[in-house]
Amino acid sequence: MAYSMSDLKKGLKVEIEGVPYKIVEYQHVKPGKGAAFVRVKMKSFFDGRVLEKTFHAGDKCEEPNLQEKNMQYLYHDGDHFQFMDVESYEQIALSDEQVGDVAKWMTDGMTVSILFHNNKAISVDVPQVVELKITETPPNFKGDTSSGSKKPATLETGAVIQIPYHVLEGDVVRVNTELGEYIEKVK
């Protein structure tokens, strides 16, 4: 299916010259003279670069052949991350580059969403909120409890976040994976 200028909106996935993009910014412009046009910023699913493009009336772009699958993260063998399709039990291996920054939030057995373009894995998404155990954080000292103060903490996955002083080593915390921020301590 082809999208016309009027179909474009933020969050829409489009394909231009064989590359799938997600529209991250959308602006409809009506100049005083001439025809209206749409200016968009699109992020590539392949390499993450952002492309700015202007669409005029009559311009078309294609809908990409994208398929999203829920897969279970099994383990990391040093070179690749191993995933299993939860429906067909088929396993795939993705390189560190294919998985990207979300690797720091993944734990064994976690269900992740993998996006495929023409049956090739192009991105991995983890849930927006995950629960992880704190494996290392400095001890608290008297007087450390001033409001708004935070300290660094290393999570079970190796990621480092800032946490409040009342949270201790061994505690489980909820983390926003998009922002990389502490949300709350799990009771």
Curated annotation (Swiss-Prot):
Keywords: Cytoplasm, Elongation factor, Protein biosynthesis. Pfam families: EFP, EFP_N, Elong-fact-P_C. CDD domains: S1_EF-P_repeat_1, S1_EF-P_repeat_2. SUPFAM superfamilies: Nucleic acid-binding proteins, Translation proteins SH3-like domain. It is found in: Cytoplasm. Transmembrane segments: none annotated. InterPro entries: Elong-fact-P_C, NA-bd_OB-fold, Rib_uL2_dom2, Transl_elong_fac_P/YeiP, Transl_elong_KOW-like, Transl_elong_P/YeiP_cen, Transl_elongation_fac_P, Translation_prot_SH3-like_sf. The keyword Cytoplasm applies. GO terms for molecular function: translation elongation factor activity. One of its GO terms (biological process) is peptide biosynthetic process. Pathway: Protein biosynthesis; polypeptide chain elongation. One of its GO terms (cellular component) is cytoplasm. Belongs to the elongation factor P family. Involved in peptide bond synthesis. Stimulates efficient translation and peptide-bond synthesis on native or reconstituted 70S ribosomes in vitro. Probably functions indirectly by altering the affinity of the ribosome for aminoacyl-tRNA, thus increasing their reactivity as acceptors for peptidyl transferase. NCBIfam families: efp, PRK00529.1. This is Elongation factor P. The gene is efp.
